[in-house]
């Protein structure tokens, strides 16, 4: 198997698969493929077989279906492009060396990689933290390619070193990093600061990848340019609904 990442702003991951080699991805990620590539879409790839494997993927923000792309007979070409400006990051996964990634962060992987929910220290991580706190866990044996949006800042945290991050900027981190929810200090800061209520607290040791273009923030920035009728529908709940909506937007 050969792979390369080409491009800068909107990179693409290209493979040349030898006969019988395969790559898995969530359904709908394909960009192009050669004539010798055979597609098989199933619920059993990427998380173990059966209902439990499907539940793990969906709970982590993934898709019910996964697709396997296999070269049959002759080498085959296969490619996956990013959906947003950003970077494609390969990580080597092995037992005891798992990764946590944001829920839109999985692009593709070798067949023995499993995708599931990243259970965290606090229940609030899955409910109150927005997109940045709903994490997928990448485990198994092989290579996974992650899709992170915007520019990347890579930090190697030392044991006990802590960094508090707006949730949407958490792209990925090694499972050795401790993750929990903290709140922004001060009631005035929460209400009027415009930075939301919750922060992700990351404590080393381990590597973290911070992304500069959270998908939720990009969507929020584009929202103001939508037709007025579409914007008005977001506040039909009245004044209270508007206040709640504003708070939720800031949590992203």
Annotate the PLM regions.
Residues 1-252:
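Composition-driven recognition of glycine/serine/threonine/acidic- and proline-rich low-complexity segments
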């Amino acid at each position: 198997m050969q792979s390369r990442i080409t491009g800068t702003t909107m990179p693409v991951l290209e493979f040349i698969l030898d006969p019988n080699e395969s790559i898995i991805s969530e359904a709908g990620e394909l960009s192009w493929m050669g004539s010798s590539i055979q597609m098989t879409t199933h619920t059993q790839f990427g998380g173990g077989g059966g209902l439990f494997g499907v539940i793990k993927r969906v709970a982590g923000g993934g898709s019910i279906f996964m697709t396997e792309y296999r070269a049959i007979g002759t080498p085959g070409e296969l490619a996956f492009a990013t959906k947003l400006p950003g970077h494609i990051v390969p990580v080597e996964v092995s037992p005891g060396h798992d990764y946590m990634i944001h829920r839109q962060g999985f692009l593709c992987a070798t067949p023995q990689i499993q995708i599931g929910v990243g259970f965290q220290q606090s229940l609030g991580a899955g409910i109150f933290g927005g997109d940045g706190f709903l994490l997928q866990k990448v485990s198994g044996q092989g290579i996974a390619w992650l899709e992170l949006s915007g520019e990347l800042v890579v930090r190697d945290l030392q044991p006990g070193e802590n960094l508090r991050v707006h949730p949407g900027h958490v792209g990925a981190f090694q499972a050795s990093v401790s993750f929990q929810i903290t709140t922004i200090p001060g009631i005035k800061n929460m209400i009027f600061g415009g930075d939301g209520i919750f922060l992700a607290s990351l404590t080393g040791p381990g590597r973290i990848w911070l992304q500069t273009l959270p998908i939720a923030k990009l969507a929020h920035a584009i929202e103001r340019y939508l037709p007025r009728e579409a914007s008005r529908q977001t506040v039909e709940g009245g004044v209270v609904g508007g206040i709640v909506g504003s708070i939720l937007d800031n949590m992203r």
